[in-house]
UniProtKB/Swiss-Prot annotation:
Keyword tags: Glycosidase, Hydrolase
Family statement: Belongs to the IUNH family. RihA subfamily.
Full protein name: Pyrimidine-specific ribonucleoside hydrolase RihA
Enzymatic class: hydrolase
Residues the record marks as active site: 240
Pfam families: IU_nuc_hydro
PANTHER family: INOSINE-URIDINE PREFERRING NUCLEOSIDE HYDROLASE (PTHR12304), URIDINE NUCLEOSIDASE (PTHR12304:SF4)
Organism: Escherichia coli (strain SMS-3-5 / SECEC)
């Protein structure tokens, strides 16, 4: 039986490719998709979800828009990374369907209530919607199998010296998720910076030759430009968000450790930092499965294989 998942995202080039990977995988049953502000404004990330599902002919999947700002902070967006639309690069189809007439939290709660088995929540943006769900529906915690997030890192940042973008946008929400008691799987920069897509990988995807693989290649063309900045020291573009889906499909591609993780919400230099107790110094019981390494070639091969689904 396919694993039921609920995807909360802020597309975003890598979010879009995570959607592509999830919907090409019969092992997964995507019950609903909710959008969050983050990589772009809430209006644009919602539109990008609708555009991607129109492209993939999956307008049957219910979609809802989430919180317009973080729990306690002003919204920060990453338009310098993802462009004016949030998915700059390819020409995407106009949406042919509308979102549900409800909030993201309402759609999440409905999805959990109606599922016969616990649902895995995959969250590839700021954790605002997930935190609101957890706080407003404690009775539904038992219906959540795990929460797989793209966010955080052990000791490095990509938005500040200490913080990864998704966590930095709403650290209070991320702290709620990590301390919820629900199993958390963390795909942080330690692993996603190793999941780089090189130019030759993009050309491999383009050569598959179907409309979706072509769009993915064009998304990567744009995404690579930002990551050419020599400060990163990258060969390609790190494909952060699809690591969450790839872990669900092929966990053997990833090396993980069980550790306690907390989120810094007040530090002068470290707001948004995920504090990973790697050496068990706090005495706290592990609350997260933390990805630390990936078989890059296996990750690329998985993407290439699943893109053929859209022929």
């Amino acid at each position: 039986m396919a694993l039921p998942i609920l995807l909360d995202c802020d597309p975003g080039h890598d979010d879009a490719i995570a959607i592509v990977l999830a919907l090409a995988s019969p092992e997964l049953d995507v019950k609903a998709i909710t959008s969050s502000a983050g990589n772009q404004t809430p209006e644009k990330t919602l539109r990008n979800v609708l555009c991607m599902l129109t492209l993939l002919n999956r307008t049957d999947i219910p979609v809802a828009s989430g919180a317009v700002k973080p729990l306690m902070r002003d919204l920060i967006i990453a338009d310098n990374v993802h462009g004016e639309s949030g998915l700059d690069g390819p020409a995407l189809p106009e949406p042919t369907f509308a979102p549900q007439n409800c909030t993201a939290v309402e759609l999440m709660a409905k999805t959990l209530c109606e599922s016969e088995e616990p649902v895995t929540i995959v969250s590839t943006g700021p954790q605002t919607n997930v935190a609101l769900l957890l706080n407003s529906h404690p009775e539904l915690h038992s219906k959540i199998a795990r929460i797989v997030i793209m966010g955080g890192a052990m000791g490095l940042g990509n938005w500040t010296p200490a913080a990864e973008f998704n966590i930095y946008v709403d650290p209070e929400a991320a702290e709620i998720v990590f301390q919820s008691g629900i199993p958390v799987v963390m795909a942080g920069l330690d692993v996603t910076h190793k999941a780089q897509i090189h130019v030759e990988d993009t050309e491999r995807f383009r050569a598959i030759g179907n409309p979706v693989s072509t769009i993915v290649a064009e998304l990567l063309d744009f995404f690579l430009e930002y990551h050419k900045d020599e400060k990163w020291g990258f060969v390609g573009a790190p494909l952060h968000d699809p690591c969450t889906i790839a872990w669900l499909l092929k966990p053997e591609l990833f090396t993980t450790v069980e550790r306690w993780v907390g989120v810094e919400t007040q530090g002068k230099y470290t707001q948004g930092m995920t504090v990973v107790d790697y050496y068990y110094l706090t005495g706290n019981k592990p609350n997260a499965t933390v990805m630390v390494d990936v078989d890059r070639q296996g990750f690329v091969d998985l993407l290439a294989d699943r893109l053929k689904f859209y022929a």
